[in-house]
Amino acid sequence: MEDQGHLPSEPRALFDRRDDTDSTNTALDETDLSRTPLQDTSHTPHAEDWSLMPDLKKQHDRNVASGFRRRELGVTWKNLSVDVVSADAAINENVLSQFNIPQHIRESRNKAPLRTILHESHGCVKPGEMLLVLGRPGSGCTTLLRMLSNHRLGYKAIRGDVRFGSLTPEEASKYRGQIVMNTEEELFFPTLTVAQTLDFATRLKVPFNLPDGVTSPEAFRQETREFLLKSMGISHTSDTKVGNEYVRGVSGGERKRVSIIECLATRGSVFCWDNSTRGLDASTALEWAKAVRAMTDVFGLSSIVTLYQAGNGIYDLFDKVLVLDEGKQIYYGPMSQARPFMEEQGFVCREGSNVADFLTGVTVPTERKIRPGYENRFPRNADELLAAYEKSPIRAQMAIEYDYPDTESTRERTEEFKLGVLDEKAKRLSKNSPFTVDFLQQVKACIIRQYQIIWTDKATFAIKQISTVIQALVAGSLFYNAPDNSGGLFIKSGALFFSLLYNSLLAMSEVTDSFSGRPVLIKHKYFAFFHPAAFCIAQIAADIPVLLFQISMFAVVVYFMVGLTTSAGAFFSYWIIIFVATMVMTALFRAIGALFSTFDGASKVSGFLISALIMYCGYLEPYHAMHPWFIWIYWINPLAYAFDALLSIEFHNKIIPCVGNNLVPFGPGYDDTTFQSCAGVGGAVRGMTYVTGDQYLASLTYSYSHVWRNFGILWAWWALFVAVTIIATSRWKSAAEAGNSLLIPRETVAKHHAVVRKDEEAQLNEKAGHKGTGTDSEAQSNVDQHLVRNTSVFTWKNLTYTVKTPSGDRVLLDNVYGWVKPGMLGALMGSSGAGKTTLLDVLAQRKTDGTIRGSIMVDGRPLPVSFQRSAGYCEQLDVHEPFATVREALEFSALLRQPRHIPREEKLKYVDVIIDLLELHDLEHTLIGRVGAGLSVEQRKRVTIGVELVSKPSILIFLDEPTSGLDGQSAFNTVRFLRKLADVGQAVLVTIHQPSAQLFAEFDTLLLLAKGGKMVYFGDIGDNAQTVKDYFARYGAPCPANVNPAEHMIDVVSGHLSQGRDWNQVWLESPEHSSASRELDSIISEAASKPPGTVDDGYEFAMPLWEQTKIVTQRMSTSLYRNCDYIMNKIALHIGSALFNGFSFWMIGDSVADMQLKLFTIFNFIFVAPGVINQLQPLFIERRDIYDAREKKSKMYSWVAFVTALIVSEFPYLCVCAVLYFVCWYYTVGFPSDSDKAGAIFFIMLCYEFLYTGIGQFIAAYAPNATFAALTNPLILGTLVSFCGVLVPYAQIQAFWRYWIYWLNPFNYLMGSMLVFSVFDTDVKCKEGEFAVFDTPNGTTCADYLSTYLQGVGSRANLVNPEATSGCRVCQYRYGSDYLYTINLKDYYYGWRDTAIVCIFVLSSYALVYALMKLRTKASKKAE
């Protein structure tokens, strides 16, 4: 069985280096791999211990035999300084402060303060060397790594010299795939499996020249992938999704290893590893370090590593160490001399401490220990240490290396590197291309991945196809069997318009989709996997079959149900035009997504754009009615060209007889066509009772000759949008490049500055040598006074957890048992993927699927109803509301989770205690933000711990890897605090990955798990871990002296020391197991016989629902108030759409055509919804995911409070939006200025704001992700728009729909109420072309001839010349009410009736948000 913990490097075939010159250059012991002059020759790397070292050497030998060159590149830097804009300058404006123009002008005059985050750093890493960069978070380690991996964007100023071999940074940028950085974050497409993720990486790095014995690129790729998976110990995860915070996948440690593999797959020459052991267990972390050492030795790599918690085993593998503090380089030199140097300055390294922690702690007053006699002369801060280092002989000797880039051997090696890279490249690539495989292979790889992404997110794919079929059937039945006469003109035009509209709305989801995988694509850009054009072409290639299927289903259903021209030529012309138009709209929205760095900006533009394109496509407003100031939009509108082509295909060479209201007069007694004429039909000629299709098209400025011209224009638009997407994609940059800084809300700036000044004064006191012991002791007693005492015993017995997988049931926990008593600090350990997080999830009642068997009890009794909120659980992933400050997040948790009988003031006072304890006072008034813009990973981890601690957990505290991502001092402080909690009676259970010996000694008991969730040990740890050591020694695995027992244990149960033994079986047969089982039974029975230690208050939530709602609504409202992008985009979309709508329908008149325009301007108001909904839903889903991931599971507040807060927090902005739209639109279109009518219409518009928000929220409430929601919107909105009586008037809607869906459609009542108030009292005045003009028989007067008509079917018509005997002029309507009657609005009271019904629909839409949220909310699994 493959050892899980092994993390070998790549096979050497992965690092092909052609050598056409001298084979001696490739020898492992060559002299030019020599270390620094100060290298301690007694230091022997432990890479030889690595189990896969022989395989690595075989690969190396194969490369030598194949004649591969060595690609070696050292890194040298001198006087390197980096400046950024000070964090204090990064102010997060709120909705009101952004309009404070005078303040912005004043601030713009002040030059933004700069902060030096890296100060005159220097160093040299030659091929074959490893450098360890140490420093506390914020000291500049990551910045240095970014400089040394040539990631230079996002900084205000960079000074100094960096050379890669003899290359300058500009020259090295052509080789970005060879100088790579593995960042701290794991960025993947979560729905792809591990194998699919690695397939993609390896496929794009296959060299052109293959090693001897490898038959094909595919064989090389397969060999690479299988070796990497196997060597990293995660072969068993190959078919498991990678996952993320919200998608279940591999464990956190396994995900980190996938990240490492992907980085190794680049086959680079310079590797920068940024805290790459975060989330790995101690044994796996050590194996990874050995792998890097082996790679570096065998292949001459340059490896630069920064680690926060480096055990001595890892530390000893490095050649050099560089220590940073406050950006200053306080040590750089040989690893072996770092500790002696610091000890010479007067610092003492405690016994059992990690040397790395000792080096980073020398400037921390609470961490350092001073040698007797040095109390008054040791360096107290970074400046003094830097001065001491500058005077040391180490500094002078290391400076010798800085000429390395200019040496002849380096220049030769760099030329060799260039040739080696060139040998690997596909021959069709240009010399300066950073890529490895040719463009076609890049496209192929991207296409495969694109189909995998589509297929692994089946729900999104299915909703797109299902909604298309449903919408096609609905639309086909709505426009069913449209007649071939004048009555069918409007219906057929509506059907053709809807064909474009629906597919365009569906394409809007591309904006949402554009942002979902962007961080992954940016990472791959730095890895030089593919050109952005390859990705864009792959998206198109994936689009084509999906869209062909989608459009074919839609076209077949709609075309033949509507009864459009039944000829093959006409059908396929319709089909191809719809397909091309959809391709164009997809490309357009994808380009918009690519052009913007934020989703809010893209959604604002796309929402406004869809309104503009729909309005100016020629359907709502014909070309001749468009105003000159906006008519240019028609000519740049792809939908206009498509609509022109569709109408021309349908009506060309048709004879269209006028019928019904379009024929004047008609009815009994009017059968002679000589004395009839068409009315209200475009292109009608006086005295004619029909119009030809081409006449009708000409009246719209369309022509059949335009069809294929427009087809070509549509493809030209498509090509333009694709080109824009490619250019925009190539300019994407990561969030960190924009400058990673703290964000301070405008309203807390003064508070933050006060805290900063206080900190600066404290630092000055420290530099002056003052000590604050009195204050520290006071704070200490204050903390002790507030800590919670607990008396409950928590037990679990025979716990088994099973989940269903495609290959059958999989056991993740196998008969696990244990307990945590008051005052006990328990450690839960095991290799990555052993089931530690799963066990905590099950114990904390956080699982919503799978099967749990066994018992979980408190005081020998079933878990109380309040358990989930009474037990604190710090999860591994830090999920927080990004627009909350640190203090607000802690107060929110304290107010909602501490018992209801505790006064509010006391809860908030406890928050101050935790802020001091976790040293968060300098961050308390800053926004949490997102990674890259806000708190760092380490700071977020402290906030996560704080959020749980402020809740005063009364039963126990679970912490899942609370020290991952923290530096050694922060990790020790965290565990020391947990120790303190335990000492006052709290029960604490912690999963921990890489504890130092010091850290491990703080724990009382250990539960050790092996692969498959099997128990390996449970019991006391003992002084200096002696009890655990004795147990393993007894079974043949003694812990050597000076080896961290925590690392040793993991190595024994899952690493190369396992000796193939089943340690679970060893445990089950041991006396310790029997003793622990008996003690567990005794604890349960004893606890059950006593009164419970914790009295259950019987409440599921700590606070009443009303209090929950108030607190959560306040947080949501504050969050929206600070989310300027979201609010301003909503406001800008309303103002822009309103002005656009108003000026497009400027001062509408009172003619028959103007009645239609009034209908259409109101109809266009509806289309403000898609843009706002598309922007609203991702925010709703992000909030819901935060709630689902953490707040729901800890019973912080009810889902009812959550939904209420989300709904209510939007209200103020919806009111503002309604006012703005009304003011910008109502008077510009010339609607009645009477206050009663204007007020009524404003009220309806306000109701509509609430209505569409409710619709968007109920879709989002149940949607699994934002893309799914964006694809569902067209189905819902398309149906509502179709049946509101505009596209097809009420009288012509098919009977099946007319009698139910029409009456259940809120848009119907919205349109009806607004039309009644704006049109009912209008006097209709026909324009010249709108009159039906005809002669009378036998010289009778017009009044006499039309008397029967005017008293019957034409009673609403207006005869303007009754006494005339020829040229009778009849207008279709007298008043607006006559027009409204034809669309089923028969009386004025309909306006108020419909208004009331709209209000009812508003309430019902919000009720659906509650219903669907409840339907989606799963209960936690209980043990069976």
From Swiss-Prot:
Chief localisation class: membrane
Transmembrane parts of this sequence: 488-508, 520-540, 544-564, 569-589, 605-625, 629-649, 710-730, 1131-1151, 1161-1181, 1200-1220, 1240-1260, 1268-1288, 1300-1320, 1395-1415
Regulation affecting activity: The efflux inhibitor FK506 impairs the transport activity.
Residue stretches of biased makeup (Polar residues): 23-42
PANTHER family membership: ATP-BINDING CASSETTE TRANSPORTER
Induction notes from the record: Expression is induced in triazole-resistant isolates.
Origin: domain of life: Eukaryota
Membrane topology classification: Multi-pass membrane protein
Record region (Disordered): 1-49, 760-782
Positions annotated to bind ATP: 830-837
Keyword GTP-binding applies: no
InterPro entries associated with the record: AAA+_ATPase, ABC2_TM, ABC_trans_N, ABC_transporter-like_ATP-bd, ABC_transporter-like_CS, ABCG_dom, ABCG_PDR_1, ABCG_PDR_2
Family of the protein in this entry: Belongs to the ABC transporter superfamily. ABCG family. PDR (TC 3.A.1.205) subfamily.
Residues listed as glycosylation sites in the UniProt record: 79, 275, 790, 798, 1265, 1338
Classification via Pfam families: ABC2_membrane, ABC2_membrane_7, ABC_tran, ABC_trans_N, PDR_CDR
Protein location: Cell membrane
MF-aspect GO terms: ABC-type transporter activity; ATP binding; ATP hydrolysis activity
Protein name: ABC multidrug transporter H
Keyword Nucleus attributed: no
Domain ABC transporter: start-end pairs: 96-351, 794-1037
Keywords linked to the UniProt accession: ATP-binding, Cell membrane, Glycoprotein, Hydrolase, Membrane, Nucleotide-binding, Repeat, Transmembrane, Transmembrane helix, Transport
Chain's gene name: abcH
Primary role: ABC efflux transporter that is able to transport rhodamine 6G (R-6G), a known substrate for many ABC transporters, but seems not to transport azoles.
GO cellular component terms listed in the entry, alphabetical order: plasma membrane
